[in-house]
Amino acid sequence: MMFNFAQPVYPLVLTAAKNNPENAHQQLLKTLHRLDENRHTVWGKWILENLDHSFTFEDSRLQQNLWGLTFKTPVGLAAGCDKDGLAAGIWDHFGFGFAEIGAVTLHAQPGNPKPRLFRLPQDKAALNRLGANNQGAQKVAQTLKETWQRQPRQIPIGINLCKSKITPLEQAAMDYVGSFRYLEEDADYFVVNVSSPNTPGLRSLQEGEQLNVILQELQSVNSLTKPILVKISPDLSWESIKLIIKLAKTYQLAGIIATNTTIKREGLKTNILEKTGNSIQEEAGGISGQPIRQRSTEVIRFIYEQTQGTLPIIGVGGIFTAEDAWEKITSGASLLQLYTGWIYQGPWCISNINRGLVRKLEKYKLSHISEAVGMDFNS
């Protein structure tokens, strides 16, 4: 017997997430990890079947091949959700076409002091200053190896690599390379994260020479020729983005992920952060969700225009609906990622977005999603 899984309990999950979002999230990941460990038991199979029934939707018109990988749908899970890869084998059962693990650093690190994750419901946003808390590349590699032994990857898995807090900026390249060496066999693509606002000095690596060295060193050890992308900030100037595009071409990067969270606070409805009593202007961290939707789309359009559509873009930032997704695709994104939207809209939002994308294809008389990529520039 099948039923729409989680619908009766989702309001309870939301209440828990509101009271302590980080704790609720950790409990969810631990539960999903336990489910993965028991995927071959009777109850494990039953739950996974119900997840598939409730949350997945596939249509051949949405399937794409990029970098030698098959993406059944264009909607993936953004980094920041599953930092240690605990649920890496489960995300396909929620309808995601791919999932990005991390951010992962070479050295395990606890992240910043708590509280460090806040929901801003008035803005349909989140503020996080987690600080890349994760178990470190070696442990994450072990977790992923065990996961793939139970069940081979069903969707492409990416790993978002970040610099360890204890590593000096001038040694950043070796930090990324060290993580990559541990993890290169356990994922399908890799992301150089130089845009998180929560690791001191990290965003300065986007500017020129140091990113140059990181990309050079990574590609020099990339013997399996894994696709490597770079994830950029929405707060960069157009000139800085042009420089990153140039580096992407020089080092034959697979694409650009646009964008990470913003440190800007303009236009927010939230004035005071309830949990701390402080003004939102004074609170450190990156904002994700609806407030960055427009800016991330502008960055996507700029990259697509500058590269004439020759460099694949993964669009992320403020995707809640099929309309949001369509806007990013027609602006130039081949693939999409979301996390904050998934939390606010519930786990049904992935299949809702994919169904909505198919309706858009039918409306515009297009036979495949790839025809919609950058469509705004062709009309």
Curated annotation (Swiss-Prot):
Gene name of this polypeptide: pyrD
Subcellular location(s) of the protein: Cell membrane
Catalytic residues of the enzyme: 196
Reaction(s) this enzyme catalyzes, per UniProt: (S)-dihydroorotate + a quinone = orotate + a quinol
Single GO BP term: 'de novo' UMP biosynthetic process
Cellular component aspect of the GO annotation: cytoplasm; plasma membrane
Binding positions for substrate per the UniProt entry: 83, 128-131, 193, 198, 260-261
EC number: 1.3.5.2
NCBIfam families named among the record's database cross-references: PRK05286.2-4, PRK05286.2-5, pyrD_sub2
Cofactor annotation remark: Binds 1 FMN per subunit.
Cofactor: FMN
Keywords for the protein's UniProt record, in alphabetical order: Cell membrane, Flavoprotein, FMN, Membrane, Oxidoreductase, Pyrimidine biosynthesis
Chief location of this protein within or outside the cell: membrane
First-level EC class: oxidoreductase
Family: Belongs to the dihydroorotate dehydrogenase family. Type 2 subfamily.
Molecular function via GO: dihydroorotate dehydrogenase (quinone) activity
Pathway: Pyrimidine metabolism; UMP biosynthesis via de novo pathway; orotate from (S)-dihydroorotate (quinone route): step 1/1
Positions with a binding annotation for FMN: 79-83, 103, 160, 193, 231, 259, 289, 318, 339-340
Protein function: Catalyzes the conversion of dihydroorotate to orotate with quinone as electron acceptor.
Name the record gives this protein: Dihydroorotate dehydrogenase (quinone)
Superkingdom per UniProt: Bacteria
Membrane topology type: Peripheral membrane protein
Oligomer status and interactors: Monomer.
